[in-house]
Amino acid sequence: MMRGMGNMQGMMKQVQKMQKEMAKAQEALNEKEFIGEATNQLVTATFTGDRTMKDLIIKEDVVDPEDVDMLQDLVIMAVNDALVKIEKETEATLGKYTKGMPGF
């Protein structure tokens, strides 16, 4: 009977260790910056891994009051590019911890 308890304690320690490692990885990911770009860097959007926008740069030559739609499209492209990069990095970084776990 004690043998089973020791095994359970060992598993719990492993789970706690994995949780700490995962929290560390998440924290590092949250601090990392991701830059999304649209068409020759006419618009760039910088986010942190927790999806907080830190910067948005729009080149002057793309600002045309007669074509606001194009500028809006470029901003959307840059933001989406950054978010895709964050998602891929998140999966690569945290996926090893959640692989095979239901609901993750």
UniProtKB/Swiss-Prot annotation:
GO MF term set: DNA binding
Compartment annotation: Cytoplasm, Nucleoid
Family annotation (InterPro entries): YbaB-like_sf (IPR036894), YbaB/EbfC (IPR004401)
Domain of life: Bacteria
Keywords: Cytoplasm, DNA-binding
Cellular component annotations (GO), alphabetically ordered: bacterial nucleoid; cytosol
Family of this protein: Belongs to the YbaB/EbfC family.
Subunit structure: Homodimer.
PANTHER family given in the database record: NUCLEOID-ASSOCIATED PROTEIN YBAB
Function of the protein: Binds to DNA and alters its conformation. May be involved in regulation of gene expression, nucleoid organization and DNA protection.
Name used for this protein in its record: Nucleoid-associated protein EF_2780
Source organism per UniProt: Enterococcus faecalis (strain ATCC 700802 / V583)
